[in-house]
Amino acid sequence: MTQTPVDYKQTVRTPKTDFPMRANASTREVEIQRFWEEQGIYGRLAQENPGEIFILHDGPPYANGELHVGHALNKILKDIINRYQLLQGRRVRYVPGWDCHGLPIELKVLQDLSQAERSQLTPLDVRTRARDFAQRTVQSQCASYKRFGVWGDWDHPYLTLQPEYEAAQLGVFGKMALKGYIYRGLKPVHWSPSSQTALAEAELEYPTKDDGSPAHTSRSVYVKFPLISIAAPETATVMAAELLPRLSAFHDREEELIDALLGERDDLPEIAVAIWTTTPWTLPGNLAVALNGELDYALVASDEHGLLIVAAELVERLAGTLATRFETIATFRGRELEGSLLAHPLFRRTSPIVLGDHVTTESGTGAVHTAPGHGSEDFELAQRYNLGVLSPVDDYGRFTREADSDRRENLPVFAGKAVLSDGNQAVIEALSAAGALLKEEAYVHKYPYDWRTKKPTIFRATTQWFASVSDFRPQALSAIAQTEWIPASGENRITAMVAGRNDWCISRQRAWGLPIPAFYCENCANVLLTQESVEAVQAAVRVHGSDIWWQKEASELLPPGIACAHCGGTAFRKEKDIMDVWFDSGSSWAGVLGRRPELHYPADVYLEGSDQHRGWFQSSLLTCVATEGTAPYKTVITHGFTLDEHGRKMSKSLGNVVDPKLVIDGGANQKQHPAYGADVLRLWVASVDYTSDQLVGPSVLAQIAEVYRKIRNTARYLLGSLNDFVPERDLVAFDSLGEVDQYLLHRLSVVHLEVTQAFESYQFSRFFQTIQNFCVADLSNFYLDISKDRLYISAEVSLRRRSCQTVLYRVLESLTRLIAPVLPHLAEDIWQHLPYPRSDASVFEAGWPVDHSQWFQPLTVDRWPGLIVLRDRVNIALEAARNAKRIGSSLEAKIRLHVEDPALTDELARQKDELRYLFIVSQVELLDELPAEVSVEEGAAVIVLDADGQKCERCWNYSVHVGEDAEHPTLCERCVSALAGAF
């Protein structure tokens, strides 16, 4: 009777799972997001988790334009933190926000209108258009953020245009005003002629070239201010003594020369103080020249330029600049020249010499032209010396008629000319015509531009509203010191900014924003800004929104019977200025954290780009410290900026912009623009050191996608290998596991600890490195490789197989949750494909993995690294034999092995029966001594021989026992035993 052939392939237990090999992210991720939304996973966890409330307060992005990869970096970082906190059992409260007021949106809605059309718009017209634009942008950006996989209260975001938010902001303003921190005054501020409004420091940018060097070029000039008189007689006497031998007109008449220097005669020889400025257009506003009282100044002579006074330290440098040779006649301390009078080169007025610590010898002449209406340091000097303020420039950056007042004869007219173009040229021409121009040259340097119009700004003195930072600066610095800053350098950065900043200009001359709730008496122009008046406006805005300010008259907004405290008048007009948008967003701790149920401040975390040290971090700090005496945050985390793969800024002109939508959903040409999905983008975020600038581009994303693929394939193999495993039935106790199994669980416990520490310390790149190494080195290249024999060949319910499955189960359960904060879609997809029942509908309901401290096995750790290194040596030898065509599969080989390390020799002897599985060969022999022709390299010798015996049809191992079993003549002894359920 002929025996029916057995199909042994059917007895091999290969992995089986319906978890797809390909992610199909563009469709599968959307399905998973729909599942989360339909099941209400985020909302349920946020409400029902047993832990404390965790608040990461969202810094509001601007509701203007499409999202770029920098937005993705920011929101994904926040989501990683929030998802980890949810898995830890905390009740996360994440309210997304948008900054909706301000100039960029106003300009956007006006850009397509003609000047005539713009002039017809009322403030309410502008506001309606701006509001509609902002709300449309919010809807668009909201959808994109959700597609990134970001969880939050998307149905109830905060918008700075919401009436309840605006009312809270007015409350902050009112508290600051009542404490005396808000005032109105004339000061130089950053002014944008292109936008016709004051700007905060955070609304400026400083253009750079691709190499990071400044991209702005100014026309700098060296100018002579003729000396009229010396203030100090002692100085005049010394100067006269040194000058007398050189002046034939005063031969032997020293007393007369002294009198001339003191201004008591009109025959003073031509002496001038030389100044240098990069803003010639500010010279019509000059009211003084500043020296440093502690610097030495030299009176020098040259054939080309006569007698000049410059910093002694700069004489040689200036001689080169002016292409001349200087002879030093006398030197004086700057303080000895204080109060001396100079003639303005263009106007019939004098400019006194004043002293200022800001004057240095780093550049220029050591003498600084001082225009109090065009610089903060100049303004402070003017206050000290009672110089007054002159700023003959209008809102559009053009000279006013005041710029021509007392102008010397035969000089060009300045009025009406733009100070940054033809006005600047006119001043330079006037200096030349007056004989005061020593030199003009181009000067490349940092220069502030309007962040939205991308055009240069100016310093201009105007009447504005200010927050007096100096009044609460010490408290702000103390609050900074009590905050955790990540990276730590952030503390030094914001400390220096707050310590050195001027008062905060909070008013803007536009329509789209929250009004400054001040009124002016029609009779005496006195300002009305009281608790009663602010609360009345606040109440109206809370109900009707800030449009009410433009819809109602002052009398309709103010409480009945209110009167001017100065004159008793009862008629008032409204302030026209609105608040700085940084005051808007800087009040979010009050408008969101202080108003919504279960929210509070200080928040646990603020996280934004490093530019927000001068922006939102600072404005939030100042408003909160001023009103509450504390910082609004406990921890502040900053990230850098996204650059292309070559470290360049992204721009459409360079064609190097990375569009997150294109990364996620792909392009028309999928080969050129693959649909990577949100998780690959998220994995990139976790892979970089976000505290510095990050590189991203096609090759970077391709590398990240490969890491994602390896993690996914690892998970797929784990799922497939557990297709017949029921944890409640099949789990093997730790003590009953084999040593390699215990070692792998030890490694899992270490990975669990390292990943937890990475998330706790916000060092997400450590997560990336740890998970990548675990999936590749520990699992794919080691444990999963050596476990295939047990999983495929052994009897289904054997201890050998169930032990391995127990480890895979533990790994899958932990790994899925460990990756969930960064790769939520992949983690959820794995969870939904678990081959055994789970009570948790979502991986996020399962919580963070439990720390199994009993898995930590130091003894096992000491043994296995040496074995793994030896395994690598064996693999190298096998690969060499394979390349030499001596073997095909490693199972065709027998290994003879000798090591010189006694401890490792003992370990090999102890593990002798398991070595064939460790090396994936058919036989292993340990040699006490080596043949003479074999040498030891790096402490070991590996000899590759042909395996003994015949190839088993079922497991493909070679064995001398193949054919011994009559029922299964083509099988080895292991497979015969496995089919009988005994191996």
Swiss-Prot record:
CDD domains: Anticodon_Ia_Ile_BEm (cd07960), IleRS_core (cd00818). It is found in: Cytoplasm. A motif ('HIGH' region) lies at residues 61-71. Its cofactor is Zn(2+). Signal peptide: none annotated. Its main location: cytoplasm. Binds 1 zinc ion per subunit. It holds the Pfam family Anticodon_1. One of its GO terms (cellular component) is cytoplasm. ATP binds at residue 652. PROSITE patterns: AA_TRNA_LIGASE_I. One of its GO terms (biological process) is translation. Keywords: Aminoacyl-tRNA synthetase, ATP-binding, Cytoplasm, Ligase, Metal-binding, Nucleotide-binding, Protein biosynthesis, Zinc. Zn(2+) binds at residues 952, 955, 972, 975. Its EC number is 6.1.1.5. IleRS has two distinct active sites: one for aminoacylation and one for editing. The misactivated valine is translocated from the active site to the editing site, which sterically excludes the correctly activated isoleucine. The single editing site contains two valyl binding pockets, one specific for each substrate (Val-AMP or Val-tRNA(Ile)). Catalyzes the attachment of isoleucine to tRNA(Ile). As IleRS can inadvertently accommodate and process structurally similar amino acids such as valine, to avoid such errors it has two additional distinct tRNA(Ile)-dependent editing activities. One activity is designated as 'pretransfer' editing and involves the hydrolysis of activated Val-AMP. The other activity is designated 'posttransfer' editing and involves deacylation of mischarged Val-tRNA(Ile). Monomer. This is Isoleucine--tRNA ligase. It comes from Gloeobacter violaceus (strain ATCC 29082 / PCC 7421).
